[in-house]
Amino acid sequence: MYLKSLTLKGFKSFAAPTTLRFEPGITAVVGPNGSGKSNVVDALAWVMGEQGAKTLRGGKMEDVIFAGTSSRAPLGRAEVTVSIDNSDNALPIEYTEVSITRRMFRDGASEYEINGSSCRLMDVQELLSDSGIGREMHVIVGQGKLEEILQSRPEDRRAFIEEAAGVLKHRKRKEKALRKLDTMAANLARLTDLTTELRRQLKPLGRQAEAAQRAAAIQADLRDARLRLAADDLVSRRAEREAVFQAEAAMRREHDEAAARLAVASEELAAHESAVAELSTRAESIQHTWFGLSALAERVDATVRIASERAHHLDIEPVAVSDTDPRKPEELEAEAQQVAVAEQQLLAELDAARARLDAARAELADRERRAAEADRAHLAAVREEADRREGLARLAGQVETMRARVESIDESVARLSERIEDAAMRAQQTRAEFETVQGRIGELDQGEVGLDEHHERTVAALRLADERVAELQSAERAAERQVASLRARIDALAVGLQRKDGAAWLAHNRSGAGLFGSIAQLVKVRSGYEAALAAALGPAADALAVDGLTAAGSAVSALKQADGGRAVLVLSDWPAPQAPQSASGEMLPSGAQWALDLVESPPQLVGAMIAMLSGVAVVNDLTEAMGLVEIRPELRAVTVDGDLVGAGWVSGGSDRKLSTLEVTSEIDKARSELAAAEALAAQLNAALAGALTEQSARQDAAEQALAALNESDTAISAMYEQLGRLGQEARAAEEEWNRLLQQRTEQEAVRTQTLDDVIQLETQLRKAQETQRVQVAQPIDRQAISAAADRARGVEVEARLAVRTAEERANAVRGRADSLRRAAAAEREARVRAQQARAARLHAAAVAAAVADCGRLLAGRLHRAVDGASQLRDASAAQRQQRLAAMAAVRDEVNTLSARVGELTDSLHRDELANAQAALRIEQLEQMVLEQFGMAPADLITEYGPHVALPPTELEMAEFEQARERGEQVIAPAPMPFDRVTQERRAKRAERALAELGRVNPLALEEFAALEERYNFLSTQLEDVKAARKDLLGVVADVDARILQVFNDAFVDVEREFRGVFTALFPGGEGRLRLTEPDDMLTTGIEVEARPPGKKITRLSLLSGGEKALTAVAMLVAIFRARPSPFYIMDEVEAALDDVNLRRLLSLFEQLREQSQIIIITHQKPTMEVADALYGVTMQNDGITAVISQRMRGQQVDQLVTNSS
């Protein structure tokens, strides 16, 4: 097993991904100080799980991420991957190559991977621990590690040996077992307490379970009796309903016959009504026709009058067409023709002028040609003087060139000036807009502050509203739970009041027959003394108040006759004694009270209360009660817990049933608490509604504030964008202004220089002309030719002016002819429209006259039609009156039949109601059976109907089985036929038996079974926990023994190797390792004793720096040789050694190379010489580490490092 490669990405100074590939043997990493060599060691420690930032030479773990340089930005994460060759299966994983990756981000998040799969730090540490690489990282010896080893405590030195020997995993196992033991101790104590408590609860719950089992048997008997009675009721009610149904059917037949006769009469009445309606409709139609014809005749008469008047008006002659233009179209066209002729003449003149212009241009060209020929002749004549005047011509040319250049520069300067003014104006405008927008941004920023504060206030208010709503909701839920709990308690207590004894029977069946109600409801007891008064009253606490002895006798007789059970009755007319104890002022000992003083009763029960409670005192406890009775035997003393003491007897104990008096008091107390709880719930509900409204308002306000803030942010962002654009435009304009200004300055400087050159050249030219001696005579004919050319130029200019004048006159006349032609066409169209309008008016007059004639004919016909419609209307009215008389007779018959059908309908409804009531009673009975017994009606009648005989009871069958087992000749009990009276008595007996049992816990059986099961389960768990504790103690003992054995063997081997290594490093010296507490091998530390040759040193602090380093190296090498690891990493461990000691150490490294891989950071040349491969680490000015490598064996160079930017 050895390290194959190390890949660093963003780790410390390794900004670019860098991969170092290792091989077995010694690998030396060299380079100047500060180049990042030690970062390789830190990366190996970090990827193998190092958690100490100081160990990695940093202040915090995030310092391992590349922090950036002046030329490179910082990175967001650091990642290191180490690949390990596992072909020898040294690591407990089924891979021949294992890669471990650690990754850290700026936010502190860290990730680990093994072969690309995510894992935990513990997984990495456990994977490496089996190969001797533990959390202490003894295989990595960093800078300062040697001094730390010698200055550390003896117990810390022990950790190095334990880690190399693999003891740490045993210690982890022991620590885990001890933690389990601590947890198990708490669980053991809890289980013991639980089993003790369950064992205490089992006995009373077992008694309740027996009572519940007895009650279940009685309830089964009661259920059977009630089911049979319910089935009998259901059969009886169904028979009654069938009889009602038959009567209803007969009544329905009679009703249907009367309804049929009524239907015939109704149809006849409907026929008459239809005929009357038809006649009415026809009469109405005739009436409408008459009205329509009369109105139409009126409209026709009006139309005739209007048409006559229209024909009269249209005969008038229309007005003239138009007076806008007095000229006729022919005159306008003639004028247009004249203008066109003039235009043609002007065009002919224009052509002539153009021809003269062409001739003048030809003449000018000829004259200029002759002038040019004369010039050339003149030049030929003076060519002989050219050489002498060459300098003069050159100067003249230069002057002209310079003058042209000056003119060009002037034009350029003028253009630049215009552009400079434009740029300055644009810059000024842009800057003004920039300042305006900047001012608006300032205003928005001020508003933004207010919006932020407003938003924060609304959010804070919303948070308070949310908290208030949550608080009120929690309080409301608590109040609702309390209300539900109190209602359930009241219902449960009310069930206790529903007694099944004689008092309940009397209250249900003879209410009002001299009965006032129960004593518990009529009497009010002071709170806290209900149990005492219930014990003092005894059976009377559950009694009924009756109106005297007569009512009491009647009630008892009724109970006997109905077999309704027994009841206690209190007489309301019992005379009160003159002076009861409470009123006579008779004193009681301190803490005792008269029972009568604790009771408030109605006037009619005062005598009975005095009779029952006279001589009864209420005390706090049983001791006071016994003392009071011993002093005053004539009294009875009752405690607040319900223990009663009299002369010679005591009644008390536990498991007492609540009396009706106590139950009523508890109900009253619960009702008062319920009223308070409901009031509180209502208050909370109202407060919650208000809080929700407030919350909604606050939510809306917060959303509005947020929207306003977002809108403001959007506006500010847009303003900032506009501000940036304006700033750029202003800067561009200013830069252009500066650039143009600079160009103009440069051009002006060039112009100045050029003018100076022109002046200089002109001076030279003037001097040359003054010294000119040869004058070239100009021929006379050349002057004539030039004059002729000038005259030709004047003629060409005059011809060009004539052409321009002719063109303007032609353009002026060209549009006038078109305008006149359009005017003539418009006048002609107007005259046509006038003729058309006159023809239309004549046609309209003829049409109006024709309409008037036709209207007169139509009016005569309409008047005759109106007379005919009037006659038809009168005849239709007479027919309608005849139909109405016949319809009245039929309606009387319909009314008579309707009354009979109504009576039959009422009778039928009564029968239907009776049938529905019978069905409702049946449905209610079926619903009651379904709800109480969970049986369908059909199953009820099938299994428990009157036709089903009663099977023998369980007791009869048990007696039969017993007799048969005894060998007696017995006959099996036969089923008994159904008898309602017998079943009613059977149900009452079962009810009395349940009443005698008292309050029964119906869940006792299930609770007892569950509790017993839980007790057995917990008992088993308790034994399992004890056994597991014993096993864990055994595991701890085994681990301790294993630690002792492994550590002892490792220490012996390391101590032996230390002697040899120390002697090799210090020839003639002596060194050994010593246990600080040999008697306690589990906690003993290790001391190092070193005596270099020729020195008597007892303390390590007296050694020199090199001797300390060699001693620490000796201890590490001893550990390495005693318990070899696959690889070791050392960072400048030989820096303090001289050449002799260094070579001794290197000889040890060469021995270690045979078994392990060594990676060493060094500056020493001897160390480099023994290395199998060298890695050179450099750092340029960019602050980023780069690595190069060279394999030393065989002087062959391989590229083992990959750098990528």
Swiss-Prot record:
<feature type="coiled-coil region">
    <location>
        <begin position="330"/>
        <end position="499"/>
    </location>
</feature>
<dbReference type="InterPro" id="IPR027417">
    <property type="entry name" value="P-loop_NTPase"/>
</dbReference>
<dbReference type="InterPro" id="IPR036277">
    <property type="entry name" value="SMC_hinge_sf"/>
</dbReference>
<keyword id="KW-0963">Cytoplasm</keyword>
<feature type="coiled-coil region">
    <location>
        <begin position="979"/>
        <end position="1033"/>
    </location>
</feature>
<comment type="function">
    <text>Required for chromosome condensation and partitioning.</text>
</comment>
<dbReference type="GO" id="GO:0016887">
    <property type="term" value="F:ATP hydrolysis activity"/>
</dbReference>
<dbReference type="GO" id="GO:0007059">
    <property type="term" value="P:chromosome segregation"/>
</dbReference>
<feature type="domain" description="SMC hinge">
    <location>
        <begin position="514"/>
        <end position="628"/>
    </location>
</feature>
<dbReference type="GO" id="GO:0005829">
    <property type="term" value="C:cytosol"/>
</dbReference>
<dbReference type="InterPro" id="IPR024704">
    <property type="entry name" value="SMC"/>
</dbReference>
<dbReference type="GO" id="GO:0005694">
    <property type="term" value="C:chromosome"/>
</dbReference>
<protein>
    <recommendedName>
        <fullName>Chromosome partition protein Smc</fullName>
    </recommendedName>
</protein>
<dbReference type="InterPro" id="IPR010935">
    <property type="entry name" value="SMC_hinge"/>
</dbReference>
<dbReference type="InterPro" id="IPR011890">
    <property type="entry name" value="SMC_prok"/>
</dbReference>
<dbReference type="InterPro" id="IPR003395">
    <property type="entry name" value="RecF/RecN/SMC_N"/>
</dbReference>
<dbReference type="Pfam" id="PF06470">
    <property type="entry name" value="SMC_hinge"/>
</dbReference>
<feature type="binding site">
    <location>
        <begin position="32"/>
        <end position="39"/>
    </location>
    <ligand>
        <name>ATP</name>
    </ligand>
</feature>
<dbReference type="GO" id="GO:0007062">
    <property type="term" value="P:sister chromatid cohesion"/>
</dbReference>
<dbReference type="GO" id="GO:0006260">
    <property type="term" value="P:DNA replication"/>
</dbReference>
<dbReference type="GO" id="GO:0009274">
    <property type="term" value="C:peptidoglycan-based cell wall"/>
</dbReference>
<dbReference type="GO" id="GO:0030261">
    <property type="term" value="P:chromosome condensation"/>
</dbReference>
<keyword id="KW-0238">DNA-binding</keyword>
<dbReference type="GO" id="GO:0003677">
    <property type="term" value="F:DNA binding"/>
</dbReference>
<comment type="subunit">
    <text>Homodimer.</text>
</comment>
<dbReference type="Pfam" id="PF02463">
    <property type="entry name" value="SMC_N"/>
</dbReference>
<dbReference type="GO" id="GO:0005886">
    <property type="term" value="C:plasma membrane"/>
</dbReference>
<feature type="coiled-coil region">
    <location>
        <begin position="802"/>
        <end position="836"/>
    </location>
</feature>
<feature type="coiled-coil region">
    <location>
        <begin position="169"/>
        <end position="288"/>
    </location>
</feature>
<feature type="coiled-coil region">
    <location>
        <begin position="661"/>
        <end position="771"/>
    </location>
</feature>
<keyword id="KW-0175">Coiled coil</keyword>
<dbReference type="GO" id="GO:0005524">
    <property type="term" value="F:ATP binding"/>
</dbReference>
<comment type="similarity">
    <text>Belongs to the SMC family.</text>
</comment>
<keyword id="KW-0067">ATP-binding</keyword>
<keyword id="KW-0547">Nucleotide-binding</keyword>
